[in-house]
Curated annotation (Swiss-Prot):
It is found in: Plastid, Chloroplast. Keywords: Chloroplast, Plastid, Ribonucleoprotein, Ribosomal protein, Transit peptide. The keyword Transit peptide applies. It comes from Arabidopsis thaliana. HAMAP family: Ribosomal_bL12. This is Large ribosomal subunit protein bL12cx. The gene is RPL12C. NCBIfam families: L12. The keyword Plastid applies. Belongs to the bacterial ribosomal protein bL12 family. GO terms for cellular component: chloroplast stroma; chloroplast thylakoid membrane; cytosol; plastid large ribosomal subunit; thylakoid. One of its GO terms (biological process) is translation.
Length: 187
């Protein structure tokens, strides 16, 4: 078996063009080996751009507007939202009661729908200079704000402290801030 392995190794070595000592010097550059297979240029893999399947067929005008809006940056989108709110005289908070009124059952218009407010905003109106540190500590205890952000919050009042919270949370936040010395209101 040893003689068979030796003869196979000798055959491979002698048939290899790179190991022939008579034709190549050890410092010479070896020749490049090319693989026998090549991809033809006609069999390239190309991505096919398919149009997404949509549930609603939109007119060309709507598709154009949608593509323009989707190409906006975040800053441009924010400016667009502000512009449309100013143009139509709406705010995000004014849309929630309107949606609830639309969803309410119609009783022929005879009964007036009385909406009970479910979301409240806590507004810090004033902070006396003698109680600024205590109010900053209370703000940090009620939120996850850092010291710098809490300090900036109580400057340039009135400012909304918390938005869209329940009545119980609003009452508790108001109580805590008033104990610290701030003048607070719930809207």
């Amino acid at each position: 078996m040893a003689s068979t392995t030796l003869s196979i190794a000798t055959t491979i070595r002698s048939s290899s063009p790179l190991t022939s000592a008579s034709t190549h010097h050890f410092l010479s550059k070896p020749t490049a080996i090319e693989f026998p297979f090549r991809l033809s240029s006609s069999s390239s893999h190309r991505a096919i751009n398919l149009r997404p399947i949509s549930a609603v067929e939109a007119p060309e005008k709507i598709e154009k507007i949608g593509s323009e809006i989707s190409s906006l940056t975040l800053e441009e989108a924010r400016i667009l939202v502000d512009y449309l709110q100013d143009k139509f005289g709406v705010s995000p908070l004014s849309l929630a009661p309107a949606a609830a009124a639309v969803a309410a059952p119609a009783d022929g218009g005879a009964a007036a729908v009385v909406e009970e407010q479910t979301e409240f905003d806590v507004v810090i109106n004033e902070v006396p200079s003698s109680s600024r540190i205590a109010v900053i500590k209370a703000v940090r205890a009620l939120t996850s704000l850092a010291l710098k952000e809490a300090k900036e919050l109580i400057e340039g009042l009135p400012k909304k402290f918390k938005e869209g919270i329940t009545k119980d949370e609003a009452e508790e936040a108001k109580k805590t801030l008033e104990e610290a010395g701030a003048k607070v209101s719930i809207a």
